Amino acid sequence: MPAPVLSGPQYLREGLKLVLSPGLRLFVLLPLAINLVLFVGLIYLAGHQFSLWVDTLMPSLPEWLSFLSYILWPLFVVLVALMVFFTFTMLANVIAAPFNGFLAEKVEVVVRGTDDFPAFSWGELIAMIPRTLAREMRKLGYFLPRAIGLFILSFIPVVNIVAAPLWLLFGVWMMAIQYIDYPADNHKLGWNEMLAWLRQKRWQSMSFGGIVYLVLLIPVVNILMMPAAVAGATLFWVRERGAENLVTQR
């Protein structure tokens, strides 16, 4: 098996070790804590409103329907659990996006041994949010038309047999784009330039995107793997770009 195909798991494994180190834990724990506080607050508000609704509803029902109060609450708990399961990771990605840029910076400092980036400050983090969200919207703009095209393809007879493998390949490619974009954006590499560079490193990109795609499918584990993927993508960036520069200098 070619070495580039094996590089993805190696980068992710090294990235996981880095984010568990004392100097980088802040950028993992802080967005996770914000996400947890937000979800706890939303669940509390939803529970309070639901309780008021049940208290208002039950007196208006016939007595023989009083058993509904014992059914409504379990249904509410199941609904909340499903909502958390399907939206926690999605919201965590949005909240962590500005922190991921800083995490990529700090990983690069650790790997290179030189700090060419400004020190972390809350002011800079807040100033970074519009740019980060704009970049996330750019990713969404890249993803949606292609996803819609594949969705339509899934309903075309005969042709739809290729839809499943294409969905898988596209998902893997998007994982590479999602995480390599953080170090690329830190170095002000344009969107189209980043895509062109990833295509040049196609085997490495698909290897990295593939392993990230797999681990992010695992509930709970995926929360830790998101920052590990940022760190792994930064290692990918530093080493692959460094190798290119070395070849250019020669």
Curated annotation (Swiss-Prot):
GO-annotated molecular function: high-affinity sulfate:proton symporter activity
Pfam families in UniProt: EI24
Segments traversing the membrane: 26-46, 71-91, 150-170, 211-231
InterPro entries according to UniProt: CysZ_sulfate_transptr, Sulfate_CysZ
CC terms in the record's Gene Ontology section: plasma membrane
Taxonomy, superkingdom: Bacteria
Intracellular or extracellular location(s): Cell inner membrane
Record's keyword terms, sorted: Amino-acid biosynthesis, Cell inner membrane, Cell membrane, Cysteine biosynthesis, Membrane, Sulfate transport, Transmembrane, Transmembrane helix, Transport
Membrane topology: Multi-pass membrane protein
Listed NCBIfam families: PRK04949.1 (NF003433)
Function text: High affinity, high specificity proton-dependent sulfate transporter, which mediates sulfate uptake. Provides the sulfur source for the cysteine synthesis pathway.
Name of this protein: Sulfate transporter CysZ
Species of the source: Pseudomonas fluorescens (strain Pf0-1)
Source species taxonomy: Bacteria, Pseudomonadati, Pseudomonadota, Gammaproteobacteria, Pseudomonadales
